[in-house]
Amino acid sequence: MSYNTNDIMGYAQDPIVFSNEQGGNELYEKVKEVMVHGINENGLPATIFEDTIKSGGMFGTKCPLLMIRHSDSSCRFFMIGIFVYGNQVMFALFGESAENTKYNRKQYYQENGNFIKAALIKPDEFKLQSELQWREDILNVFNNATH
């Protein structure tokens, strides 16, 4: 399944720019090596697979995409998609997060004064914290290797 930039649900962190790297496929291969090694070395619950992401129409840009999802299929977390555009490494979120969606919906209703609807939505705080911790652990693999 090829992804499109329209499939991006947000970003896990800001892009990281490498000024001394060539970028492109060479940088992507280095990122892939760091992530696969780091996730395995740290024993993180993750399944890694490769795909592509496309931007624009029929003649748009296509880039390799490293997808990381939680290895427990009962955990409905966002997937993290890492791709390189030029000399920037991007960390996009794909798919759906059940608890994050509930939390955002509750926040939206509270901010817009609909407190009755907000009171009816009850995200599981433990699951939400678990997802945020998992995401942070995955991102730390890359951040610790590059700093």
PLM features: what roles do these ranges have?
Residues M1-H147:
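A composition-biased, non-transmembrane "mature-region" signal
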